[in-house]
């Protein structure tokens, strides 16, 4: 891209920002998107910088289709116009040809997100009812399965015997938030976001303790109903293969009571998936057996449609085999005759499945199909609710920019919170979904920042303590006019002084030694300015080098023998010093003679002509060469 094009793109952003500030009106994401280069591929950094530029300037960024929003649109001629959108419908959609081809993930994400209409209160209620209806259908279907009944009994026994925690059985958060209505109060959120996790942890523990007796009582009732239903189901299964017998049983009327009790408990997703996993596993095994039987029948000339007509809806047992042996079609007779052992084995395997599920094969398949259909209905409704509120995630995520996570990571974490909000939303409360979801999105983002933003992870409870101390420090700075000391902060928070100092030390952010210093490329890196304790200081290296040179010149004024003796005795220019005995062996003289030569040489060095050259190094102590320093002391 040429410099002129870059300047033109920057001019569009600056022009949009300038006019928005002068008119004191907000902009939308579409306005920023349109101001970016259309037929280019703007990077993620460019998009983030554009959004942050408006946010730092104090210009509000609104959604494209928000109630009663004032929309600022910029065209190619850069003329601005005001319009009010009250019908929650997108007005000035970007033309497809203007978007251009792009493979930038952020641009594509915003484009797809902008194509989904926002929901009115009525639409939110409609989707929430679809989710609720799908969930109710699934719960009702699960309660009709003896597999689920056995699971309920086992869970009750594990809970009573303390083999299972309550939080592993039910959704504690749903119970904890059952009586709370989160407010979308930005001012309060900024003050309390630092204490969310600690309060939530305490609240969940408190809720778990409070509701445990009630849950045990409910589970006891559920287990009792399930035991009665299992006994009745077994009797009906043994007496007759007609499913209507079980349905018409008087004790089976307890099924509605079981459904109501299970719906009130709110089992968590893991427990529901445990039951579904067992049922789906049996269903897959059943499908594999039926598929193998169909392929075998086709080898004998039985058409697929004829096989389905005779197999589907029939109770596969010995009576069915006798019936098919009398079938008028030769293919069936041949199949039943030649594959008699295979048919008997399949009947036995189906009988095992029926005893395991407590239902006839056809009834079990219908039950699984009903559950799968309700799951698809629920997932589609949740998908619609999530896609319609993705703009809300971006509007919240931009407030947490520059806190250690990339903008895209903030969006993804916010989306996770949005999905949790969809699962917990109760439309009967009367408030809009966006009001409820804001709390979940903000919690997901703040938790992600606490867990992932730092290079060295700090536990969440310590993060909250750090935030509390930093918040108190800012308040005291405004009150006192100077930075408060650790003692003053400890007194204000009634916290031990050692703990405050420890937390303030932990709060320091790590910094890379490769960070550039200055604006110039030649400014170097931060690591260049950190002292290396193991390296020789430049002044010490200079003194050592100078001392070595002076010592060499002074020793050169002695006789070669005297110089050699002193060098060996003090280790000057050598790896180590030598004893009198070792030097004597080198010169083949006695120790006493070496001592005399050494004494004579030292007296010569003490002469003012020689000593004045070395005295200047004595003031520096032993910063220079250790061996040369020993010579100075001598």
From Swiss-Prot:
SUPFAM superfamilies for this protein: Sigma2 domain of RNA polymerase sigma factors, Sigma3 and sigma4 domains of RNA polymerase sigma factors
Phylogenetic classification of the source organism: Bacteria, Pseudomonadati, Pseudomonadota, Alphaproteobacteria, Rickettsiales
Protein name, entry field: RNA polymerase sigma factor RpoD
Motif Interaction with polymerase core subunit RpoC in this chain: 409-412
Region (Sigma-70 factor domain-2): 385-455
Subunit structure: Interacts transiently with the RNA polymerase catalytic core.
Species assigned in the record: Rickettsia conorii (strain ATCC VR-613 / Malish 7)
Subcellular localization: Cytoplasm
NCBIfam families: PRK05658.1 (NF004208), RpoD_Cterm (TIGR02393), sigma70-ECF (TIGR02937)
Sigma-70 factor domain-3, as annotated region: 464-541
